[in-house]
UniProtKB/Swiss-Prot annotation:
CDD domains, per database record: neurotoxins_LC_scorpion (cd23106)
Modified residues (Serine amide): S65
GO biological process, one term: defense response
Positions of modified residues (Pyrrolidone carboxylic acid (Glu)): E1
GO molecular function: sodium channel inhibitor activity; toxin activity
Superkingdom assignment: Eukaryota
Main location: secreted
UniProt entry tagged with the keyword Repressor: no
Function: Has a toxic effect on insects and mammals. On German cockroach larvae, it provokes contraction, paralysis and lethality. Intracerebroventricular injection into mice causes severe neurotoxic symptoms. It fully competes with the binding of the iodinated Css4 (AC P60266) on rat brain synaptosomes, with moderate affinity and in a concentration-dependent manner (EC(50)=25 nM). It may act on both site 3 and site 4 of voltage-gated sodium channels.
Membership in a protein family: Belongs to the long (4 C-C) scorpion toxin superfamily. Sodium channel inhibitor family.
Protein name: Beta-toxin Am IT
Length: 65
């Protein structure tokens, strides 16, 4: 699956500014994906190849912050 990484504590997307390295590390090492980057226009980490449960979904996840 592809999409924005989910912060399971807050229900929000994992935020970033311009740091592809941190998003890629989060995607690869912690979420089982193969490539992650900071999507600049949304200021959120986008991950390719992660499990669906690791990704933010507009319909099912509510941001608490």
């Amino acid at each position: 699956e592809h999409g924005y990484l989910l912060d399971k504590y807050t229900g929000c997307k994992v935020w970033c500014v311009i740091n592809n390295e941190s998003c890629n590390g989060e995607c690869n090492k912690r979420r089982g994906g193969y490539y992650g980057y900071c999507y600049f226009w949304k200021l959120a980490c986008y991950c390719q190849g992660a499990r669906k449960s690791e990704l933010w979904n507009y319909k099912t996840n509510k941001c608490k912050s």
